Amino acid sequence: GLNDFLFNMNGFIALPEEGVDYDLAFAAPDSDFKSVLSLVPGMYTESFSSIKSSGTMSFEGFVKGLYTETSIPSFDINLQIKDGMFQYPELPKPVDKINVNMAVKNETSQLENTSIQIPTFSMNFGSNPISGNFTLQNLRDYLMEGELNGKLNLKELTSIFPIEGTSLAGNLDFSARAKGRYDSTNKVLPAIAAQFKFSEGYVKNAEYPAALEKIHAVASIRSDKGSMQDFVADFSSFGFELEGEKIEGNLRIADFEALNWQGAVAGAVDLEKIMAIFPIADTELKGKIQANINSTGSY
């Protein structure tokens, strides 16, 4: 097993003249959601046993065939999680309504024919829902389709996953859809439509008395045809306030080959105050930036 995740395996592994021959089936005997939770990076610590949890899971699959320099065994791996929940005992909010359905499959001897199906993925961080789905048909032309939607309240989120010495607040709404083929060589992208809105943002470091406040941003990313040329990233507004000093701006980038941009930034910021909130090791910045900039151009 791995961490607290145990599984049974039966079958054989043989060594013919060429390669390795596999005929293995595996399944998890324990349907407790907490066992698969132990695989999440950072979760399996000394305090893991004290985490409250509920929900069920199933895990099963097989690997069958010859592994050589030019071929792989066929395989089918399935994971399902139903109504999962976990909560740290010292924190007020759980992560619950975790539902996942995932299958990774290859019925051939070629790795490029591997498919990934995630028709269901959803969870609630307290009262903050996230849901989505994803399909990748193969690793050859990377034909894919997916969607991700969510609403996050950062103050509530940090009551589940606290960040020592830092206070956060703000509301994040996002939605994203992608469908099509990805080919980096020929600069082909899936058709993409994504929207992002962040409002009432707040960041405060315990070692500095002032907070970064009124953080806001509205952005969209779009590529209707799935090409670099029609890719548009539009940050229609962004800004923040620090001890009465404001920064406001916008930026639009179109055509990721030509990198045509149009943007503006106006306001003032004290670099020493910013570094106090977001410290960078072995780095010291001082000075005040005052700006009223409009810029248009291409790379």
Predicted regions and their residues:
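Disulfide-stabilized extracellular beta-strand modules
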Residues: 190-192
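Short glycine/proline/serine/threonine-rich loop/turn segments at secondary-structure transition edges
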Residues: 70-71, 187-188
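Short solvent-exposed strand-capping/beta-turn motif centered on an Asx-Ser/Thr pair
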Residues: 66-68, 183, 298
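Interface amphipathic segments
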Residues: 1-60, 86-177, 187, 203-296
